[in-house]
C-alpha cells in the first residue's frame, strides 16, 4: 500500500497527517483555518486520496506557520508513500473551470522541486486568508515531496474561485501523476532513478 503517517511537533505547530494515495477521497481535516480546511477537502476529493490532517498551530499569531507546515508534512507523506516511484505515471496535467475562473496545473514527480505560482490575486484576501499563503503551501509540498509544480490562473475575477480552481487542478494533476502505469515496470526516468 502507498501510505504514510507523519507527525511534526514544533513550538509553532503540532501536526499529525495520514495519507493513502490509493484512497477514495475520505478523511478528516482540522487545521483551525476554515478556508484552508476547505481547500484540503477539495484536494483529497479530487485527487482521490485518503487524507487525515490534525493541526494545532499558532493561528492567533498568523496563519503562515500552519499553512506552510501542513504543506511540509503533506510533502513528506507524499514522498514516503511514493517510495522509489516505480511504476508511476510521473506527469500530470489538469485544467479546471470554476465558474468564471480557469486554472491549470502541471506536475512532474521527477524528484526536482520547483514551483511556479501565477495569479494576479496573490495580494487578495478570502475572508481573513491571504491568497499568497497558498503559494507557501505548494512550495513546501514541492520541496518535501520532490515534485515540480506549475500552477496558473488563466482567467478569473473572484479570488475564492481562483483558489478553488488551483486546488482542484492540482488535485486532478496529482491524481494522474501518482497513478500506476501497468506498462511502466521500473522508474519512469531515462536515468534509472528519481
Task: Tell me the role of every PLM-derived stretch.
Residues 1-194:
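Structural preference for solvent-exposed beta-strand-turn elements
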Amino acid at each position: 500500500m502507498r501510505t504514510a503517517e507523519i507527525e511534526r511537533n514544533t513550538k509553532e505547530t503540532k501536526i499529525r497527517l495520514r495519507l493513502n494515495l490509493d484512497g477514495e477521497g475520505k478523511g478528516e481535516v482540522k487545521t483551525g483555518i476554515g478556508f484552508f480546511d476547505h481547500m484540503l477537502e477539495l484536494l483529497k476529493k479530487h485527487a482521490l486520496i485518503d487524507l487525515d490532517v490534525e493541526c494545532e498551530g499558532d493561528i492567533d499569531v498568523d496563519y503562515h506557520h500552519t499553512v506552510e507546515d501542513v504543506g511540509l508534512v503533506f510533502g513528506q507523506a507524499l514522498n514516503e508513500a511514493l517510495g522509489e516511484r516505480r511504476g508511476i505515471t510521473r506527469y500530470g496535467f489538469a485544467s479546471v473551470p470554476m465558474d468564471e475562473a480557469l486554472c491549470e496545473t502541471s506536475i512532474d514527480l521527477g524528484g526536482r522541486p520547483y514551483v511556479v505560482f501565477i495569479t494576479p490575486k496573490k495580494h487578495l484576501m478570502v475572508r481573513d486568508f491571504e491568497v499568497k499563503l497558498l503559494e507557501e503551501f505548494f512550495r513546501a509540498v514541492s520541496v518535501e515531496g520532490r515534485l515540480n509544480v506549475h500552477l496558473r490562473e488563466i482567467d478569473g475575477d473572484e479570488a475564492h474561485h481562483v483558489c478553488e480552481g488551483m486546488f482542484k487542478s492540482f488535485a486532478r494533476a496529482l491524481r494522474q501523476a501518482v497513478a500506476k502505469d501497468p506498462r511502466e515496470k521500473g522508474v519512469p526516468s531515462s536515468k534509472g532513478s528519481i
